[in-house]
């Protein structure tokens, strides 16, 4: 049935022309290309763009447009996924060769790209830590803050993230890879050999500093060092009160005193003619080596909450002993110390500790412990409920050296639903969009996406199908530690949670603690109580600031999808070579197996599962589905008769089209979203994408669009009748078409046909009409033409009525290119009918190019004795090749 038959009969202005427009194609097609007819139909259907004085509609029943964005929905009961131990085998390529034999060059290249993956952008912009967790849910800011921090710590515990310890050190959990062994500092609590050697050298230099000090005169040394100790104690107490204890200031004061002592005693290092500048440098380097050695010796210790009075007294006694022992044996202050400073008698107590860089870090949440509550909803009541809140931070099993990693982030994070159909679980979104914007953007590599015709050519067969899903596929691929400074995420901590207040202001009244007291509201208090019920003592760890870098491939970078496609396609290629009787292909994290019988498919599945598990690749058992003869893939149902969309997409389109209001100007954002939904099913309709050309025009003009009742009912009728996309056949071309602006010609193996147009047409339009006539009169599924526009199959650039009818006529037709000099229909199109001559032999190759799904099946290499033996239950020994 003609797609426009009902529509033309309902248009009153076309009553006299309906029979002619629906008549023979050689008469109707040139008329459909006329500009006047297209304008009259557009007027009847009200497809012209409306005037600007009309008020636009920004929201329909199912689709939102401009100025009506839906607020994100936060689920307080989100279940965070549990990640298994995702660790690929260290010698992955060698292990694969044991199972699948020698790898091809392409397979090796793809695996080497991913093991490890590398990411080095042109420029990286760093953001303050306060932007680490995006305020995506303003009404649930605190709950989202702790849920996101807990998600990041869960990824760290699974070995997916590095934890930044200082500028040059990272720690993580799990087994180190071979490239991480070269940067090892500590493994399972034991120092690595190379790191131990450097520590011994530093200890020797530190001992030389002690020998130098013992040569100093006892009187001047004792007096000066006593003054030095008192000076440092005064400065540290002062900085403790203001919250600005500077370890660099202590180092500078100590070096100045040591320089004065040495110069006053006229003791020189090395030669007698050394200058005071050389002396100062020598003492400075000795002091740095002593301090570094001391830091390394205490590096394994962690600060832990112990709030008992005995511990406080012990810390005070240690402080008193340290300050009184003026000529002590060591010259660097302890890096983990506690001091009590009472700005008001017996009220406030601040705990200050220095990290491995020497910068002060304060556990402000602990500062509430010995302070008076500011009200009924003070955080003090929650903090004082437990004596031991656990450590402020943790250290992983492995510590490695890294490039300089700043105390900044490169992208924010937030949580969303796992997918539109699963709102009970959460998914982490990493916002690394800076690498895709601006003049320093990264040009990501392109990877092949399977189109609809290719899927039909490969998979439209009568096989038994099984689909597998790789669990957390992106997190299987490791990334080089050198890329960590470019992929940083983190949390600002609870003390910086309230972004309205500036955390950089300091005064003598404990401004940071006062900032924490600003959080003491009823809402925050009740939320923290509920969060404590969820996280327990871990709430203290989540409240601390931290910075993490990705150890595995993140999903928020454009490089990730390309690398994952390379990785899974290499695996599919190896399995395909070793099981020539089955079909194996992969797209992203989906792996599909096809075999002739279910028994054969079961045997392949069990073998692949055991091999992948040994390699460290985890499959999601819950998402493994046996489809039988109807494969569900990428939203399509693929059978031996062709490809059709799934029922859920068809029902969704019907619901959206019915909800569209009639005779109201809809803004272009609604048109964009509606067109995106309709485009998914458009290839299965009679008129294809050409039916949506009026919507395309409104979107390109950024204007409103008015749906008339006729156009809406016509779209509904189109999307109610769907036709499958069938497989292409490898046949020889026997029909050729050509045209001139005034005539057309068709050549077959047994006859030559020609004709003329009633009026001159554009050459591309004339060529398209000639191809339609050849398809109607010969029924050939393969046509030869010399016009590139017709060969492309994109008909949306033609007049609307002609494009719709041509899509209907040429549905399921393939084209092959023939040069004009060799086109046998060239002379008939010019009005000449020469004698028949042999046609050029052109054979159609079904479209399988630019796709990473299917690997060719070259001869399988001889199996090595160490490989797994597997015998196919299929009786025939000939390899099965997709059509």
From Swiss-Prot:
Residues 1-183 are annotated as: Terminal protein domain (TP). The keyword Cytoplasm does not apply. Residues 397-638 form the Reverse transcriptase domain. One of its GO terms (molecular function) is RNA-directed DNA polymerase activity. The record marks 67 as: Priming of reverse-transcription by covalently linking the first nucleotide of the (-)DNA. PROSITE patterns: RT_POL. Residues 184-386 are annotated as: Spacer. Coiled coil: none annotated. Keywords: DNA replication, DNA-binding, DNA-directed DNA polymerase, Endonuclease, Host-virus interaction, Hydrolase, Inhibition of host innate immune response by virus, Inhibition of host RLR pathway by virus, Magnesium, Metal-binding, Multifunctional enzyme, Nuclease, Nucleotidyltransferase, RNA-directed DNA polymerase, Transferase, Viral immunoevasion. Mg(2+) binds at residues 469, 589-590. Residues 387-728 are annotated as: Polymerase/reverse transcriptase domain (RT). InterPro entries: DNA/RNA_pol_sf (IPR043502), DNApol_viral_C (IPR001462), DNApol_viral_N (IPR000201), HBV_DPOL (IPR037531), Hepadnavirus_pol/RT (IPR052055), Rev_trsase/Diguanyl_cyclase (IPR043128), RT_dom (IPR000477). Its EC number is 2.7.7.7, 2.7.7.49, 3.1.26.4. SUPFAM superfamilies: DNA/RNA polymerases (SSF56672). GO terms for biological process: DNA replication; symbiont-mediated suppression of host innate immune response. It catalyses: DNA(n) + a 2'-deoxyribonucleoside 5'-triphosphate = DNA(n+1) + diphosphate; Endonucleolytic cleavage to 5'-phosphomonoester. Activated by host HSP70 and HSP40 in vitro to be able to bind the epsilon loop of the pgRNA. Because deletion of the RNase H region renders the protein partly chaperone-independent, the chaperones may be needed indirectly to relieve occlusion of the RNA-binding site by this domain. Inhibited by several reverse-transcriptase inhibitors: Lamivudine, Adefovir and Entecavir. Pfam families: DNA_pol_viral_C (PF00336), DNA_pol_viral_N (PF00242), RVT_1 (PF00078). Belongs to the hepadnaviridae P protein family. Multifunctional enzyme that converts the viral RNA genome into dsDNA in viral cytoplasmic capsids. This enzyme displays a DNA polymerase activity that can copy either DNA or RNA templates, and a ribonuclease H (RNase H) activity that cleaves the RNA strand of RNA-DNA heteroduplexes in a partially processive 3'- to 5'-endonucleasic mode. Neo-synthesized pregenomic RNA (pgRNA) are encapsidated together with the P protein, and reverse-transcribed inside the nucleocapsid. Terminal protein domain (TP) is hepadnavirus-specific. Spacer domain is highly variable and separates the TP and RT domains. Polymerase/reverse-transcriptase domain (RT) and ribonuclease H domain (RH) are similar to retrovirus reverse transcriptase/RNase H. This is Protein P. The lineage of its organism: Viruses, Riboviria, Pararnavirae, Artverviricota, Revtraviricetes. The gene is P.
